[in-house]
Design a protein with these regions (language model features):
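Membrane-embedded segments
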Residues: 132-137, 142, 146-199
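Non-catalytic terminal accessory segments
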Residues: 1-132
Length: 199
């Protein structure tokens, strides 16, 4: 079996298993059938995303294509990491409910919801605002043997840009250039992870 096909089958299996376990845990909250239909419709959407990802990978030609594939993976992680955490933690709530420890079961259930929500917010922040925020760290290096001509010599080091993550029309690149120019460097060096899978 080819690796790509294995990943496709494993991905679909994980999505359906995850959603099936989640549905068993929360179906008592669904008062109408439409809620169940919407739940499985959203599950089928992610199955379609995995199939699209599998078909799209061989056609990758440049960073823009890679950008959208990365977005697809990020969206899947955004939803299924919180779901998985909720399923695991809420399993203890179910066990407590079976043991007739209803107050403790409710506390654990709320804890599961809190953990799932927190992970959703953290991942959302990571794939949207935080990943594109530039951080400036200033260091002063004193070298006594350096000629006087190099006093106040400024070096700007750019690292871990991962340009393939931005997409073709990302305006933050202009912001980055302006920020570097504002620092008024004498020398600019590029180190480490300038690109992703594509140059």
């Amino acid at each position: 079996m080819k690796t790509g096909l294995f990943i496709l089958i494993a991905g679909i299996f994980c999505v359906l298993l995850n959603d099936s376990l989640l549905f068993l845990q929360i179906r008592r909250y669904f008062k109408r059938k439409i809620c169940s239909y919407l739940f499985w419709l959203h599950s089928l959407f992610f199955v379609a995303c995995i199939v699209w990802y599998h078909l799209f990978i061989p056609t990758l030609k440049g960073p823009e294509a890679y950008f959208w594939v990365e977005k697809c993976i990020s969206i899947i992680l955004l939803f299924y990491t919180p779901k998985t955490l909720y399923i695991i933690v809420n399993a203890f709530s179910i066990l407590l409910r079976m043991a007739k420890c209803i107050p403790a079961a409710r506390i654990v259930n709320r804890l599961a919801l809190g953990i799932a929500l927190a992970s959703f917010i953290v991942i959302l922040n990571g794939i949207t605002w935080y990943r594109y925020s530039y951080k400036i760290e200033r260091e002063t290096v004193c070298i006594k043997t350096l000629p006087d001509a190099f006093n106040d010599f400024r070096i700007v080091q750019l690292t871990d840009l991962h340009l393939g993550s931005y997409g073709e029309h990302y305006p933050g690149i202009t912001k980055l250039v302006d920020e570097v120019n504002r620092l008024n460097p004498d020398l600019i060096v590029f180190t480490g992870d300038m690109v992703n899978s594509f140059a």
